[in-house]
């Protein structure tokens, strides 16, 4: 298990870089995590997805899938792919400090 310092806080990460403990995440970490995923700037639309994912995870105990983000979050799939190209669920979960969504390889 690796550790990293994000926004001045040392956190544990798994082999793929996801935070081991979602409670360690802060909003200040998100821009650093986004850069690791190739996203230079987080827009209001990115934050809408990130905040939905965190809230849904707290309520349901699972990382939301793309389908759940579309249905419960009201975020069109096309928008998800535009915001988080080549793997929106994985990238958004990573930036939100959550684990990899079920069904993602």
Predicted feature locations:
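A short, structure-level motif marking secondary-structure boundaries and short turns
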Residues: 14-16, 50-52, 74
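Metallocofactor- and cofactor-centric catalytic cores in central/energy metabolism, strongly enriched
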Residues: 30, 35-54, 58-59, 66, ...
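General structural signal for secondary-structure boundaries
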Residues: 26, 43-45, 76
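N-terminal first-folded block
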Residues: 4-36
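A short, ordered amphipathic alpha-helix with a cationic face
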Residues: 18-24, 55-58, 66-67, 79-80
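Helix-rich interaction surfaces within compact, conserved domain-sized segments
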Residues: 13, 65-105
């Amino acid at each position: 298990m690796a550790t990293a310092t994000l926004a001045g806080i040392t956190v544990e990460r798994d082999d793929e870089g996801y935070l081991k403990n979602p409670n360690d995440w802060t909003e200040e970490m998100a821009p650093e995590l986004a850069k690791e995923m190739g996203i230079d700037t987080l827009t209001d639309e990115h934050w809408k997805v990130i905040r939905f994912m965190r809230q849904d995870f707290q309520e349901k105990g699972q990382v939301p899938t793309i389908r759940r983000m579309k249905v419960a979050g009201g975020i069109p799939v096309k928008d998800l792919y535009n915001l988080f190209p080549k793997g929106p669920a994985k990238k958004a979960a990573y930036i939100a400090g959550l684990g990899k969504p079920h069904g993602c390889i």
